[in-house]
Amino acid sequence: MGCLNSIRVLGLSAALAFAASPVIKVDFDMSGRNSSEVTEPNYVPWVVSGVSSKDTSLSGVKVNVSGSGNLKANWYKAGVQSPSYARLVCDGVMVEGGGAITLTFSNLAAGTHSLLLYLNNVDGTAVSNSIDVYVNNSKQASVKPTNRALSTGEAAIAYVTFNVGGTGISTAIKLNTGTVTLNGFELNVPNAAAQATGPSPADLDYHAPHESGALTLSWTAAKSVVKHRVYFGTDSAAVLAATPSNTAVYKGEQSGSSYKVSGTTPLQTYYWRVDEVDANGTVSAGNVWSFKPGRVAFEGAEGYGRNAVGGRGGKVVYVTNLNDDGAGSLREACTAEIGPRTIMFKVSGMIQLKSRLVCNQDYVTIAGQTAPGKGITIKSAPIGFTGKDMVIRFMRVRLGYGATYDGMGLTGGDHSILDHASISWTIDEAFSSRGGKNLTLQRTLISEALNIADHQNYAAGTGHGYAATIGGDIGSFHHNLLAHNAGRNWSLGGGLDGNGYYAGRLDIFNNVVYNWVSRVTDGGAHEVNFVGNYYKEGAATTLHGYTLRAQFEGTGKGSQAYYYHNNILEAAGGKFTCDGTNDNCGREYSLSGGQVLDWEPWNSKPFFASYATVQSAKAAYKDVLSDVGQRMPVLDNHDTRVINETKNGTYSMKGSVGGMAGIPDRETDVKDTANIKGWEPYPSEIRADDYDSDLDGLPD
């Protein structure tokens, strides 16, 4: 064994409290994926694929991973995704065709070190063999890997401690025998098998649910423990170092695995730790977890994106010109890697984008209401919001005929909210939120998607005036107005999870839809609340009698079902086809693709809470028409007209190609209230330099 004289393996002893350094945590990631999708928070991502050996250097330690053959990245996609989000243990590195993996550490300081290895098979093949663990060619243990465990606490681990005789000595840890998937490792940490796991609220949850500051902490106890010591406070270092003598932080010893706290505030981050005590009195120190109680992003924010953090506490960044890119532009403000920010505007007018603008940074607020004049209008290319914890308010997109683009989107977003936006004259579709989670789209006006506008993926003359394809887990879509769009009002794009099961949970309530052509709400998702929506036929409407048409297309496994309640359908003449009292009215489903319906498609109660005030359809109709679209700093002529046409059941133009009432094919088909075709004037106004001289976001 050379200089290695101490080995400890999972299940043979309690954890040691290590003071060795450095502490290194590595997550072997799936290749070709965004780090936010596959990397466990607080771990260093490492993608190893297509090579037999790869080096990295972390905190002065050289780490090499090598295989008996070519290494490849692999994953269990469904485990990485919702609802498990097991990003640490549901991907990893393995040898193509099976074989040994060796980790070699160089430049470690002399003394005792520990290594924790995660061994969870991800490829779906049941592994019957145990994995032999060697240290410097000496077999120390055999560990049976788990197969597609869906949490870190459930995954198999190996834990060893070893002595290093000097800084020039390398230590090799070899995993041998059969199929080995190495998900990640942790150097110089306690034994996870003896620690509490599965914290709730989850570690780093900055949207923790609470009732007036009260919430319950809970965890999964380690095996064979009899007591738990709870530490709780607002100083991470104090919680980490605390002992039972620290009365301000130590909350006592208990047998249960939950602890109630009160008096918390969203303005504070909280830290807690649970030490496990076994029957012999051995204490295993726990990790320090943190959370922050959820806080409503702004007054009126509702639904699953209501607690988006946005740029709170970060920098204030001003947009000072209407350029596509460069200093002072919206693009630079969105994409610069400067951390949390609130984007405000010293300029108003029209920004003509030369290409798609993707706002991919986390913790960003875009405050369109701070612009002078008529606010900010974007044309020619779309703007999308893919970061997490984004708050976007009072923005306007009027795309126009040209390249095949959409308008706005929350695709892939997390804990984000888009509020009081206006989107029109798009060619692909106005809005999309596929792959997002914890989202809200509210009080947004989607109108006049260009219909026969030479979409690049379709034959000439094909209509594609579509409002939105929505997905999410969970996505809230409420108090929006969809007017003069031929179809996809909404298209439900729940998609499939990594196992091929129907996915997506959507909360669709209190929306107003007016003057569609042949498609209302269709498509499908796993669970949908569809409540209190108001559908009003117009002069272009050819599909009568429906608000929701569920399509079971045989593309996946599992089920798609709907809670359908209090939805109104008003015919073009003003009579009610469905007055909201009969929940069998206005809905249907269709089967295709060999789909066998072996479940009940209509649920008798909501699938999940809405975290919003849900109105009746009639009340929502009045509410939406009085408060929708980019109303700040001012509602423009276009939106004023569309709202009035919805209210009065009218239209003011026909498409120049398709000839359909209220359904444009070019933006020049449209005249505003001042009889101007296409874009109305959006004058450029610039605030004086002394408007906010200290750049704190508050006018002087």
What are these regions (language model features)?
Residues 211, 331-339, 350-367, 375-393, ...:
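Extracellular beta-strand-rich solenoid/capping regions of secreted or surface-exposed proteins
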Residues 298-343:
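Acidic Gly/Asp/Thr-rich repetitive segments characteristic of extracellular carbohydrate-active
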